[in-house]
Every structure is written in structure tokens, then in C-alpha cells.
Amino acid sequence: MAQLEGYCFSAALSCTFLVSCLLFSAFSRALREPYMDEIFHLPQAQRYCEGHFSLSQWDPMITTLPGLYLVSVGVVKPAIWIFAWSEHVVCSIGMLRFVNLLFSVGNFYLLYLLFHKVQPRNKAASSIQRVLSTLTLAVFPTLYFFNFLYYTEAGSMFFTLFAYLMCLYGNHKTSAFLGFCGFMFRQTNIIWAVFCAGNVIAQKLTEAWKTELQKKEDRLPPIKGPFAEFRKILQFLLAYSMSFKNLSMLFCLTWPYILLGFLFCAFVVVNGGIVIGDRSSHEACLHFPQLFYFFSFTLFFSFPHLLSPSKIKTFLSLVWKHGILFLVVTLVSVFLVWKFTYAHKYLLADNRHYTFYVWKRVFQRYAILKYLLVPAYIFAGWSIADSLKSKPIFWNLMFFICLFIVIVPQKLLEFRYFILPYVIYRLNITLPPTSRLVCELSCYAIVNFITFYIFLNKTFQWPNSQDIQRFMW
């Protein structure tokens, strides 16, 4: 059985890489020059490739750390000595873009290993489910698209997934180092290093909580009321955190992540903020509706798992049973949409992104719609939480805290910001039946075909520019 799974995995990886190479060739023919954010990333990488590492050579418009450029130089530069290629060829646009294609292969393998580690090993989880789940996430449209451009997404995903995998195997020093590498690709990845530490803490809390529940005589007095379970957990957390033995044990397990956290704090103090370069366009704010956008995004791409008649029926019965609670959550959500909805200047200034059309033709045209969608947001959020109910409550707590910290401060609505939390979520839901995975994979294939076709063939020009423009995520 294991041998068959190995054959299936190899076939899936080989076919995906073959298709990716064909798409890469099409991208290379269509895009001879840097496009979108590549106009910043590619010249900077080429300067590094030529050996110009001084700060005077840094483009101030770049807001991320140089992890992508350093890794790219480390990958392509040896080709000068191995294949006797010229520096012009090695540092070309095509070669630098190809680095992300290599990252995509690494991501495929890491996803497979993570599905093996995260999902409980039982007879119900067949080899075809694991391979199909890996293939599906590897071609997740928003992530897959950026494998063909010189963006930070593929490398950022690689080091974050690698850090998560090492954390699950208990190799926390390696995990923290890989978390640092992910931070060098995108500063907000520090939160996913915190998530790895939180994963360790959640595991220990879960063990202690199970011990607490198994006791015949509970030390805590019985609590009754609508929030009894919540208060009981809160009391447990307070009691647990008051124990020096527990805290010292957690410190011994998580000290590599704590050290990384101190390094991050030092960076923020020295740099004067988390953003480098052009900070005017990346100011943090409390953009609470970002959570609702993420819930909608996740519902759209995971609809085979999150949207079903039984799920809707269960949700409606809960609404009927807890009507007052639902009303309170709805009112709070409406208030957050009303007071904390922002439209970043880039959102409305660039008509090459799909988010531009979502905002302009939907939210901006029908102002009332953002309030009418609140019940759908609540359903999506509940459905996501319900799909993660197989995970311990403390794991869920850590995940949603990290999700909140990662996306809420972002003023710009950008689908790329949702990729990592979506992948972490998708890795941790119970392995779906094969039929749902086939449905999900088919939908991803259709979305990918449409987006690639539009990007490569449906070009346009701005009135004041002769450059060819393309639609993209």
C-alpha cells in the first residue's frame, strides 16, 4: 500500500511539474520584461547577483527583507561554475523566475509530508486522499499563479511550511531558524513562527486539560450557566499559568521561538517599524472586515467542505436555538463593518487586480451589500470553525489569534495575504472524502485555467501608456 502511495505521489508531482514547466514557458514568452511588483524585485535581485549588496543599491520602494534575493543568488550563481554560463544568463529574468518554480516543487513535497504528520493515521485516511489533498493544495489558484512570477509567495510558503513541519516533529531549533528564513521573505511570517510556538503550548495545554477532565473529583467547583465551559477553561488556564513548573517546561520547549521573538522586537526598534522602504502605503490599522473577507475567501475555495445542506441545516438550528447570541454577533459584526471598513488607495488605483473589480463593481456600487453579507460572513466563520472541531480547543485558539494578528492590521484588501492562513487551515481539517477532493481539484483546475487564460490572452493598455497590462490576482 505504501509503495502504491509512493507511485501515486511521484506521478502527481511529475505531472504537476510538467504542466508548470509548460505554463512557465508560456509566461516567459508573454512576459519579456518585469511585470507589476517584479519591477522592484527583479532589478534588486540582479544587483545582488552582480555582487552589489550595499545599502546604497537598495530600492527604497521594496518593503520586504531580501530573503528572496539572497536565496535566488545562492541557487543561480553556482550555475556559472557548474555549467560555465555567463552572468547575463544566470541573472536573467527567466532564471530568477525559475527559482519560484523550484520552490513550488519543494512546497508540493512539504504539503505531502505535512498531511502525513498532521492527519491522524487511521484506515479511513487512504493514500489517494493524502495524495489528492496534496495535489489540490499545490495548485491552489492564488498560490499557484505566483509560482510563475518573481514574487515572495512561493519562498515564503516554503520556509513557513518547513518550519511548521519541523515544529510538528519536535525539532524546535530548526523550526525557529526556518521561521527566521520565512521572516526574511515577508515580515508578517513572524506570526507563523509564533504559531509554531503556540502549537507546542497548545499540545501541552491539551494534555493537561485532558488530565483535568479525567479526574474523578474536580478541584474546581461545578459551574453552571451559558458560558460554563468557557469559564471552566479560563479557570484552568489561570491555574496552569500560575505554576512555575508549567511555565519553566513551556520555556524549555519554546526558547528558540522566544529568542526569535526578541530578534524580531530588536528589528522593529532599530528599523522604527515592521515595514522597510516605502511605509506610507503600508500603515497598520484595525481593519476588522479583513476577517470577513478571509472567511468569504475560504468559503469560496473550500465550498465542497464548508457548504452543504447538512451544514446549513445545522447552522440554522443553532441560530434558532441561540437566537440572542446570533443577534449580538450580527450587531457587533455590522458595527465593525460600519466603522472599520477601509479602501486602500492601491485598491482603487490599479485595475489590473481582481480585487479592484470586486470592490468597485460590488461593494462600492451597492453600499448596503456589505451589511447584507454579514449573516453570510457569520456562517462562513462558523463553518470554518466547525470544520476544525477535530483539533483541540487550544490549537483553535492559537490559530485564530494568529489569523487575527496577520490579517486585521492590513489596510489593503489583497488575496495574497490570505494564502498562508488558508493553507494552514486546509492542512488541519479532517481529510475529506475522495469525491469532495475531486470536486475541489476540478474547481481549482477550472479557476486556474480561466485566470491563466485571461492573464496571457486578455491584455489591455492604459490611455497614457504603451505598456501591455494584464489581469491577475
Swiss-Prot record:
Spell out the protein name for this chain. Answer: Dol-P-Glc:Glc(2)Man(9)GlcNAc(2)-PP-Dol alpha-1,2-glucosyltransferase
| Extracellular compartment residues | 28-64, 119-126, 172-175, 278-283, 339-365, 414-436
Question: Mind listing the UniProt keywords for this protein, alphabetically?
Answer: Endoplasmic reticulum, Glycosyltransferase, Membrane, Transferase, Transmembrane, Transmembrane helix
**The species this protein was found in:** Homo sapiens (Human)
Q: Is Cell membrane among the key words of this record?
A: no
By its UniProt entry, which Pfam families does this protein fall under?
DIE2_ALG10 (PF04922)
Q: What does this protein do?
A: Dol-P-Glc:Glc(2)Man(9)GlcNAc(2)-PP-Dol alpha-1,2-glucosyltransferase that operates in the biosynthetic pathway of dolichol-linked oligosaccharides, the glycan precursors employed in protein asparagine (N)-glycosylation. The assembly of dolichol-linked oligosaccharides begins on the cytosolic side of the endoplasmic reticulum membrane and finishes in its lumen. The sequential addition of sugars to dolichol pyrophosphate produces dolichol-linked oligosaccharides containing fourteen sugars, including two GlcNAcs, nine mannoses and three glucoses.
Question: What gene does the UniProt entry assign to this protein?
Answer: ALG10B
Alphabetical list of InterPro entries matching this protein: Alg10 (IPR016900)
Which reaction(s) does its UniProt entry say it catalyses?
A: an alpha-D-Glc-(1->3)-alpha-D-Glc-(1->3)-alpha-D-Man-(1->2)-alpha-D-Man-(1->2)-alpha-D-Man-(1->3)-[alpha-D-Man-(1->2)-alpha-D-Man-(1->3)-[alpha-D-Man-(1->2)-alpha-D-Man-(1->6)]-alpha-D-Man-(1->6)]-beta-D-Man-(1->4)-beta-D-GlcNAc-(1->4)-alpha-D-GlcNAc-diphospho-di-trans,poly-cis-dolichol + a di-trans,poly-cis-dolichyl beta-D-glucosyl phosphate = a alpha-D-Glc-(1->2)-alpha-D-Glc-(1->3)-alpha-D-Glc-(1->3)-alpha-D-Man-(1->2)-alpha-D-Man-(1->2)-alpha-D-Man-(1->3)-[alpha-D-Man-(1->2)-alpha-D-Man-(1->3)-[alpha-D-Man-(1->2)-alpha-D-Man-(1->6)]-alpha-D-Man-(1->6)]-beta-D-Man-(1->4)-beta-D-GlcNAc-(1->4)-alpha-D-GlcNAc-diphospho-di-trans,poly-cis-dolichol + a di-trans,poly-cis-dolichyl phosphate + H(+)
- Chief subcellular location: endoplasmic reticulum
- Topological domain ranges for the Cytoplasmic compartment: 1-6, 86-97, 148-150, 197-256, 305-317, 387-392, 458-473
State the tissue distribution.
Highly expressed in heart, placenta, liver, kidney and pancreas. Weakly expressed in lung, skeletal muscle and brain.
Q: Which family does it belong to?
A: Belongs to the ALG10 glucosyltransferase family.
* Localization terms from the record: Endoplasmic reticulum membrane
One CC-aspect GO term:
endoplasmic reticulum
Q: What is the effect of changing E33D?
A: Found in a patient with ventricular fibrillation and QT prolongation; uncertain significance
The biological process GO terms on file are: dolichol-linked oligosaccharide biosynthetic process; protein N-linked glycosylation
EC no. given is 2.4.1.256
